[in-house]
Swiss-Prot record:
InterPro entries: CK1_Ser-Thr_kinase, Kinase-like_dom_sf, Prot_kinase_dom, Ser/Thr_kinase_AS
Species of the source: Encephalitozoon cuniculi (strain GB-M1)
Active site: D129
PROSITE patterns per UniProt: PROTEIN_KINASE_DOM, PROTEIN_KINASE_ST
Protein name (database record): Probable casein kinase I homolog ECU03_0910
Job of this protein: Involved in DNA repair. May regulate the activity of protein(s) involved in double strand break repair caused by gamma rays.
Highest classification ranks of the organism: Eukaryota, Fungi, Fungi incertae sedis, Microsporidia, Unikaryonidae
């Protein structure tokens, strides 16, 4: 039986999405400020699933989870998840920086995104909705976290490590803009797909947009089809044109992984750290939004 959340007061709505709303809340006993995620009835059960994923992940690279249960909202009890309040998402920070990050910032973020995805994969889950909105810094702005596990799924048995069988009849799960090509083509998602989405995020941050943004369609399915066709027609070489060769190498490597292959996360991080070093830059944690002087110059770094 689901317990009632009694000591949390909802203070201010800060986000709203297809699955529910997120509030700033306050613990009326300790005065601690928290985040509270509420579930819309149409998606009943998704928040409980997300709570289970957070518990399975253990909390060292995810926000702390304080409580799950029923909470009174607008005179109705709904499912609620009380968790550590986070800072801004990468999408919010991207907007702050006029929708363009410097190469240094993107490479440092890439290293940290790979770290978070590797942590998730080692605990037998794939995220299936990797995008800038789902990477957030803590309130201090020191550490990057991957959040929103409502679509996360075990890709292998946690006891035997037997991989889930590949299916080729799946509908699109996640956000079409950042979904891997194979996700559009109906393949069951695995580790390679999360990492392809990381690659798309880096291209987005460096170029300001992806080629399949803004496509017009009459229906959602038609739009998905047009995005798929765009991803099929644009080679990775074309996608990464004008960017450091390491970004292309990253995207090419993950695109060519097999369904059950374990990615070489260390190799991917090395690609990004090498790109920094060749430019005479250090992964020092100083990002564009901290200094507010982002530079888009590629300098002498070899590009495609």
């Amino acid at each position: 039986m689901t317990t009632e959340i009694r000591n949390i007061k909802l203070v201010q709505k800060i986000a709203s999405g297809a699955f529910g709303d997120i509030f700033i809340g306050q613990n009326t006993v300790t005065n601690q400020t928290v985040a509270v995620k509420l579930e819309k009835k149409a998606h009943y059960g998704q928040l409980k699933h997300e709570y289970g994923v957070y518990k399975a992940l253990g909390g060292t690279r995810t926000p702390r989870i304080y409580e799950y249960g029923k909470i009174l909202y607008e005179n109705v009890y709904v499912n609620g998840l009380v968790m550590e309040l986070m800072g801004k998402s990468l999408e919010q920070l991207f907007v702050t920086c006029s929708r363009r990050f410097s190469l240094k910032t993107v490479l440092m973020l890439g290293e940290r995104m790979v770290d978070n995805v590797e942590y998730l994969h080692h605990r037998n889950y794939v995220h299936r909705d990797i995008k800038p909105d789902n990477f957030v810094f803590d309130v201090q702005g020191d550490r990057l976290y991957l959040i929103d596990y409502g679509l996360a799924k075990e890709f292998r048995n946690p006891m035997t490590f037997k991989h889930r069988e590949m299916r080729t009849d799946k509908s699109l799960t996640g956000t079409a803009r950042y979904a891997s090509l194979r996700t559009h083509q109906g393949y069951e998602q695995s580790r390679r797909d999360d990492l392809e989405s990381v690659g798309f995020c880096m291209v987005y941050f460096l170029k300001g947009r992806l080629p399949w943004q803004g496509l017009k369609a009459k229906t959602k399915q038609e739009k998905y089809d047009r995005i798929r066709e765009s991803k099929e027609s644009i080679s990775l070489y074309e996608l990464c044109m004008g960017l450091p060769k390491e970004i292309h190498s990253f995207c090419f490597y993950v695109r060519n992984l097999g369904y059950e292959d374990m990615p070489n996360y260390a190799y991917l991080r090395t690609l990004l750290s090498d790109a920094l070093r060749q430019r005479g830059l250090r992964s020092d944690g100083v990002f564009d939004w901290m200094v507010r002087t982002p530079s888009d110059s590629m300098g002498d770094l070899e590009i495609l």
